[in-house]
Amino acid sequence: IELMPIGFGTAMRRVSPDDILSALRERWPDLAPTDERRGNGPAHYYKSDLLLGRIGFIDAVSHKFCADCNRVRLTSTGQLKPCLCYADSADLRTLIRGGCTDDELREALKISIYNKPRAHCFDTDAAVTERHAMSQIGG
């Protein structure tokens, strides 16, 4: 999983997935991409005849997959975050504690998911609005 530049990740040196793949190919020269899918996640996989398993990469920063992202996060404070890059969220806790109906909750979920950004902003530090650490967000 590629380090995302949020929270403490902003101060850490990132290593590109391409550099990691190059290092892995020094050990397993036949490491090649596969079309294999596991679940509905964003990982893409590599295989080698010298390995029993697969090596998966989730490289959201270097190789944006935002348009196909099917992930949202629910924080411990009840905030539904459609994207890790932005501070935007839907306050489900207040909605639920206020006695919302199932239909109202479903509608809030639909709106949040429908409004997921088409791309993240991690390549422009000034555009990143999320200031919480991953541990505060739920990652």
Question: Predicted regions span which residues?
Answer:
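Radical SAM enzyme [4Fe-4S]-AdoMet core and its adjacent flexible, acidic
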Residues: 1-54, 60
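Short capping micro-motif at the N-terminus of alpha-helices
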Residues: 55-57, 82-83
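Radical SAM enzyme core and accessory elements
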Residues: 63-139
